């Protein structure tokens, strides 16, 4: 027998550097190596002695490089497969792509095996309780199993793919997974109680010791493979240690199934397990490939003489999904890609990828779960046509982006408020349910019907706001606590008004104004609002007491009843303004009179005059008239202004209240 020898200057995997020396007085010019010193294990070479010198039983010559002698000189090509192409996580998938890329035919031989005529249903039963998480399950059986090492060619291919050879039966399942991309599992029939396989959800308190020797607690949302009594595998992740293949196994049950990808990923993540099987299942596999994979495993069993396959399979098939049908429009694809590819060439390309073209529809093959929309079809055409063959096109000039009318209106409102001396502020769109109590909102108010946040940062940010007033008061209170003597603020933000349990809320924009200190009073706030409305070109507005527009703005309960008003444009309420109620003011800890307003920006934008009507300058100078009136204290100024305007007609330009005495 020949043995591996490391000559002077060689570096071994363990970090050992071979140099000339003396061993027991004898000059040493190298070292005979064991498996461990070469970084190999008995699984790689089952016939070798674990601790002694490695005796090479392969066909080799003296002086031959050890890599070549034991089959480690093969070239490995590493592919980085993106998560949207699980069909390429296999040799067959890559061969399919290579055949199309190089324009060669793909000659895939359908697996065949003879098998015994034994009736499998007499010794095995399969039941799938959760057909949503396992729409397809196929079981096959191999009798008179002969456990032993796999042939050299299989071991070398497994090693080159990063898989450790174990024994012929386990190696076959791994080999088929690498070849077809479909994970398989093998059970020892002796440990499948009553010959019954049940695919079900785990029960509370159940546990399983997996093949890695770890005991893992299961939860009801996890899908498992069980026998009549206990779990024997975690579906799509790893098998159980108890039912695994052993040296004295006589009968094996092969499993080939399709498990729902999201469920496999959640289970693997919760158990802290990442296996080759789960990595494939969680990306989505070809449900049509289960039977082909199982047949290939049986073919290899016969080829290696590892046992006697049973020809009959037991299959549970509850698939309801149909192949995706995607619109096919060659003209759109050419416009999308900037190409001039003929329909015939596109059809030829797509059919070479097993994508059927039926008129104006493409039918996706079962293994291409990434094909969903026309852009995906265009991508297939482009990558086979060659990205470097797509001509460069000059970017076409496009019109400069313009603000929408709504954005222009909001921008103008902001600019006007800044021009009036107000500072902009920005608050969170979520708030606390307690804010309604702080402004004295009635318990049955519709504003208390809010959208609850599923994962809030805390109780103070647990709902979406239905009114912007509390947010403005929070900012004013913060400024007051920080000893800002005079503050004038505005905010343009959204309110979130629920529309139904399964629909998105309405999100109207609101302009909220808040001020205190300095020259702040009701009339200063009213003057700012009037200046804003005039700049935004709203029709003549009037003011009424909140009691005359009851129920329109429920937040008016937070205002002083005698120093507040609802703003009307025509007959339409567009906002309110007034002094904060002393009780609310005290609740927020503000020690001075505070004034607030809220305007319905969205409604105002719809009512604003879109066009400015030109009027020539008057030929005659304006005449100012002072009118002194004696009237009841309860008479609103708006009523007097309305009477004057009606009496004066078109000649009147403006009415202004300038003194009360």
Residue ranges and their predicted role:
Residues 36-37, 43-45, 54-56, 147, ...:
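Conserved catalytic alpha/beta cores of large enzymes that bind or transform nucleotide phosphates
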Residues 352-355, 499-507, 512, 519-661:
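A carboxyl-terminal module marker
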